[in-house]
Amino acid sequence: IDFDEPFHKLFNQGMITGKNGIKMSKSKGNVIYADDMVRLFGVDATRYFVLHEMPFENDGIITWDLVIERFNSDLANILGNLVNRTVSMSNKYFDGIVKSTGATGDADQTAIDADLKAVVTGTRDKVAKKMEGLRVADAITEVFALFRRCNKYIDETTPWVLAKDEAQQDRLAEVLYNLTESITIGASLLHSFLPETAEKIVAQLNTTLREFDDLDKFG
């Protein structure tokens, strides 16, 4: 290859191996084909596994057990359950339309809201920094840290308890608004990696994907 400038750096992706780091081989019967993964789990789930489990500069291990585990723990549990719970409560309590009421609750609840918003609005720059260093797996991990924080927020605010108290309806609306806004920002960050999944999420939330430059703003 002809270069006009001195060759300074070469980025090389690690190898994809089977169980226990053993090289994939047809003779060993441990080859996993992308077409089979797509047929069983879909394009986005396959893309997620490959991007998340193939860390930069290191070899990545892929087995059917690992694929299923990652699908269940991350996509179904952390993300899927979060979206389903939020959409279900929004539909049940507010006919799917939630707006900010500014009801922050007591001092503890105010601090919880502030922490959620800090995590959410700070994720964009973390993702950008990881991507600048070609750390795709780490960038995806940052997005899922946002979703994990949202799940924790549900446990901290107990919207199902708020729903039983007529005096707490504004607070309930604020909690669900914060969740909807947070998930929308998370989905917008996820769109570069899992486009179909991100679009389905905002469709369920009745929101739209945001531009990257706006993902450090809440509300």
Regions found by a protein language model. Name each.
Residues 83-127, 151-168:
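Conserved, charged catalytic cores of large soluble enzymes
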